[in-house]
Design a protein with these regions (language model features):
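Claisen-condensing/thiolase-fold acyl-transfer catalytic domains that form or cleave C-C bonds
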Residues: 55-58, 62, 81-82, 95, ...
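Acidic, glycine-rich active-site loops and adjacent beta-strand->loop/helix elements
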Residues: 12, 78-83, 109-114, 137-142, ...
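Buried hydrophobic positions in well-ordered alpha/beta secondary-structure cores of metabolic enzymes
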Residues: 6-8, 34, 61, 72-75, ...
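Acidic-glycine-rich active-site phosphate/pyrophosphate-binding loop
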Residues: 25-33, 84-98, 135-141, 198-206, ...
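Condensing-enzyme catalytic core mediating Claisen C-C bond formation in acyl metabolism
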Residues: 1-47, 149-222, 226, 230
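Short acidic capping loops at alpha-helix termini that bridge into adjacent secondary structure
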Residues: 32, 68-74, 101-103, 131-133, ...
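Flexible, glycine-rich active-site loops centered on histidine and acidic residues
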Residues: 126-160
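Phosphate/pyrophosphate-binding loops at sites that engage ATP/ADP/AMP, CoA/4′-phosphopantetheine
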Residues: 57-73, 230-247
Length: 294
């Protein structure tokens, strides 16, 4: 049976840095308030579209793998902030990087999106359906923010990260072992953008012009830590490894309280936990690949 490996990686973090002090000039907040609750010190704001950031990250990943864009067989872009609904953001990326031989599509699973896309890329390569997959997580999430809501406005940032997946030739290739993805649909309402999509009231100008967030921070903390700890433990078990074997742990960079609670609950005695939320904020589907590249 074929095994897959990550052979290239790249990222795009916008140059426009927005510090907490910068943000407090137009949001009812302060540096102290933000850091105490989220651990975020700064985040990146993009002046270009999601596909533009994905293009840069993707090109870096392809070059890192020693490939050309024409070598890519499938582009999977994880995002909840696509440039457009039709065509997909992945279609824009295909055109911009010149991956003329690739099938392309978007995956929308919000913060978990990159892991879903990575699992699909692994399955494609290991089934021999495709030889080389470019998997990208990219978000222009600041475009969606409600600046009157400091609970969400202070937390998020923009960015993109990408990896190339190919057949693993040997154990030193960075083989992809196992996944544990899933969803509990019992509490969908704790984090929603309910009026963005076909549920939007297009005939109410005030409603249609505003992107509203439903954000229950306490429930997100409790369910997020519990679910990520369970999924991480299951993935380790599926791989045949033990918790003691793990050297580096790269969780979703939700906020520092969630990351540190997850680190404690999971209990990886020999692992270094990568923490980048202070630099980039929560970049949703881009958080894991950008932290991986950093």
């Amino acid at each position: 049976m074929l095994k897959s490996a990550i052979t290239g990686w790249g990222k795009c973090t916008p140059d426009n840095i927005m510090t907490n002090d910068d943000l407090s000039k137009f949001v009812d907040t302060s540096d102290e308030w933000i850091q105490q609750r989220t651990g975020v010190k700064e985040r990146r704001f993009s002046h270009v579209n999601t596909s533009d950031m994905a293009e840069i990250a993707g090109k870096h990943a392809i070059a890192c793998a020693g490939l050309n864009p024409e070598d890519i067989d499938v582009v999977i872009l994880a995002t909840c902030t696509p440039d457009s609904i039709v065509p997909s953001a992945a279609a824009h990326v295909q055109k911009k990087i010149g991956a003329v031989n690739a099938s392309v599509y978007d995956v929308n699973a919000a913060c978990a999106g990159f892991l879903y896309a990575l699992e699909q890329g692994k399955a494609f390569v290991e089934s021999s359906l495709y030889k080389r997959a470019l998997v990208i997580g990219a978000e222009h999430i600041t475009w969606l923010l409600d600046w009157s809501d400091r609970n969400t406005a202070v937390l998020f940032g923009d960015g993109a990260g990408a990896v190339v997946i190919e057949e693993s030739k040997n154990e030193s290739d960075g083989e992809i072992y196992s996944f544990s993805n899933g969803l509990s649909s019992d509490n969908l309402e704790i984090l929603e953008i309910p009026n963005f999509g076909s549920a939007m009231d297009r005939f109410n100008p005030d409603e249609a012009a505003r992107v509203r967030w439903t954000f229950d921070g306490q429930e997100i903390f409790k369910s997020g830590v519990r679910a990520m700890a369970q999924a991480s433990a299951e993935a380790i078990e599926k791989s045949g490894l033990s918790k003691e074997d793990i050297d580096i742990f790269i969780p979703h960079q939700a906020n520092i309280r969630i990351v540190e609670a997850l680190e404690k609950k999971l209990g990886l005695p020999n692992a270094t936990t990568i923490k980048k939320v202070h630099r980039y904020g929560n970049t949703s589907a881009a958080s894991i690949p950008t932290a991986f590249v950093d």
